[in-house]
Regions:
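Alpha-helical substrate-recognition element adjacent to the catalytic core
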Residues: 2-106, 173-267
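A cross-kingdom feature marking solvent-exposed beta-strand/loop segments within repeated
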Residues: 20, 26-29, 40-41, 45, ...
Length: 329
């Protein structure tokens, strides 16, 4: 019987998002592929430390108790020999990851289709943008900012796992992440007043799917399975958005139309998201705006969804910060 991943939540993740390969990556990005490969060979038997998204992957794989619901695949620009170190690091850390694709410097996102991936996490912004523009759910993993000099991704992943050992917590921005950027375009082109009027007038019309809607839908299915099967690991989701009333109504009605339930919704009206994320304690947070990612990355692992009106041109997301604090996404 042929093997298929069609009924699984498939997460494709780069080796640098999964493990701390920052030192090796500096050699790679310097353009000396031979020196990079030699460095990886020298460290072949040295397990890499956990990276930014390690904690989330470990918890997602814990959902496979009793049945195989989640597949994590390493999808990397590294060469196949460097892939040996990635797999041995998985084994050392107890991650049951069995599949990987290594492209030796070529962009790897084309393999998302045969993998049927519900999410692609990478530290490479070009790969993420290419995947998003091709219609695949993807996010650029932001480097963590640590509150203490002695902290790193490994210690922070461990601390997060210990805090909520039996619960996967994932937080999403709304517009241009879960939802399309339709409302964001109104704001960018016509201003806050037009945005509020547009959302109030269209409150009964569901928004179109955003790039990470497939991930939320897959998590919702797993959430129902976990609740029904008395799984030890639970899933809890949150919508963390700069929308406020009356624009909140269309967001909730859209989720209702999709038959997707979320556990928490925060309509912040431009307040900084970081303090609210600190209370929710997510394992991962997704947002389309650099500003919100910067606010969040000292609190949690963060992914930038570089698509939509806020990312339409270089510098646009940053340039709009002073005016975007009271609007939709």
């Amino acid at each position: 019987m042929s093997v298929s991943l069609t009924d699984k939540l498939v997460v494709a993740i780069s080796s640098r998002a999964l493990f701390d390969f920052e030192e090796e990556n500096r050699v790679f990005e310097a353009g000396d592929l031979g020196a990079y490969e030699q460095l990886q060979r020298e460290r072949l038997n040295v397990p890499a430390r956990p990276g930014v998204a390690f904690g989330l992957m470990r918890k997602l794989l814990a959902l496979n108790t009793g049945a195989h619901h989640v597949e994590v695949v390493i999808l990397s620009r590294s060469d196949p020999i460097s892939g040996l170190r990635a797999f041995s690091s998985c084994r050392e850390h107890g991650l049951n990851i069995q599949r990987g694709v290594f492209t030796r410097g070529r962009t790897p996102w084309h393999y998302l289709k045969p993998l049927n991936a519900s999410l692609f996490l990478s530290a490479n912004p070009d790969d993420v943008r290419a995947a998003l523009e091709a219609g695949f759910p993807a996010a650029r993993v932001f480097p963590r900012v640590f509150p203490r000099p002695d902290a790193n991704s490994a210690t922070m992943s461990a601390a997060s796992a210990d805090r909520n050992a039996n619960e996967i917590r994932i937080a999403f921005d709304g517009d241009a992440v879960l939802f399309s950027d339709e409302a964001e375009q109104i704001f960018q082109q016509q201003g806050l007043g037009a945005f509020v009027s547009h959302e109030r007038d269209n409150r009964d019309l569901p928004l179109a799917h955003g790039p990470l809607q497939p991930l939320l839908a897959a998590l919702h299915r797993l959430q129902k399975l976990a609740d029904g099967n008395a799984q030890n690991m639970r899933i809890r989701t949150a919508l963390v958005t700069a929308r406020s009333a009356p624009a909140h109504e269309r967001a909730i009605r859209t989720l209702m139309a999709w038959n997707i339930e979320i556990d928490e919704a925060m309509f912040l009206g431009g307040l900084e998201k970081g303090p609210f994320l600190r209370e929710f304690e997510p394992d991962f947070f997704f947002d389309d705006q650099i500003r919100h990612c910067e606010s969040a990355r000292s609190v949690t692992a963060t992914g930038h969804v570089a698509l939509g009106a806020a990312n339409a041109a270089p510098g646009l997301a940053t340039a709009s910060h002073t005016t975007a604090d009271t609007r939709a996404p």
